[in-house]
Amino acid sequence: MLQELKGRDYLSLKDYTKDEIKALIDLAVELKGYHKQGIRKEILAGKTLAMIFQKSSTRTRVSFEAGMYQLGGLAHFLSTQDLQMGRGEPISDTARVLSRYVDGILIRTYAQAEVDELAKYADVPVINGLTDLYHPTQALADVLTIVEHKGYLEGIKLAYIGDGNNVVHSLMIAGAKLGMEVRVATPKGYEPQEQIIKMSMNFAKENGGKIILVNDPKEAAEGADVLYTDVWASMGQEKEAEKRKNDFQEYQINDKMLELADKKAIVMHCLPAHRGEEITHEVMEGPQSVVFDEAENRLHAHKAILAALL
């Protein structure tokens, strides 16, 4: 299965089958095990990754850089200031040039169309490190974390409470393909994109999953195995922050919300978190929080993607 992924792009989990996603999860578990035992597996010795960042990041940058190093490879960080792409060079030219230098390209940017165009013209695998539409590398770390703490994915009830953003788009696709019940609670007007809803529902039908959309966060949280949230205002939405705070007041993951979930529910957040807004400090630091395990798993999920594709 993993051999079939060699040379592939990782733009969205919609492009990956259930078995392929499971294979990546299994590889991440294996690589994490080696790391914990202090065993160095230089699977990517001599390989180089170019990392294009038009959006700043802590976890994505450090986890991919550390991941390449741990697998014996090298990562080059390229900000907007480092690239001619920001000065008018077409994405197609950048893709062709970088393909002559490196073995893979990671890009974190705003428009999904930029990632798709980069992949179209690149001769090496392109990895989507985040766009306004998708966050597929985060989603892989998320399902890895659920497997670690719950032992299974099929039938898991995940309640995402908050903004219908790129994170939940990728969670819906991953959950649908893996047979999970993904409940999404947003205020009216903040729902996931219609195309993502339809796509995810189709994937759910094919794989025994379920996608449920509601406006009542308590309805979503009732009996859930996983409570998941993200910031209410994403990067680029700073001007909307105050309005969003008002609109999302009832969507905070707090002790009362946690009481509605299953007694053994886990709490997840992709970070960075605004404590006291979408999640309380008490819940984030509480015994049911796996937020920092989830953050750690970015490293191992990303290593699995790199090892499989490069």
Annotate the PLM regions.
Residues 54-66, 150-229:
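Glycine-rich phosphate/diphosphate-binding loop of Rossmann-like nucleotide-binding domains
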Residues 96, 103-174, 269:
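Anion-binding alpha/beta catalytic cores of soluble intermediary-metabolism enzymes, centered on
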Residues 48-101:
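Active-site cofactor/substrate anionic-group-binding motifs, chiefly glycine-
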Residues 202-282:
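Rossmann-like adenosine-cofactor binding region
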Residues 71, 101, 121-123, 178, ...:
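Short, structured coil segments at secondary-structure junctions
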Residues 1-62, 66:
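Positively charged, low-complexity intrinsically disordered leader regions
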Residues 264-265, 271-310:
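Adenosine-phosphate binding glycine-rich loop
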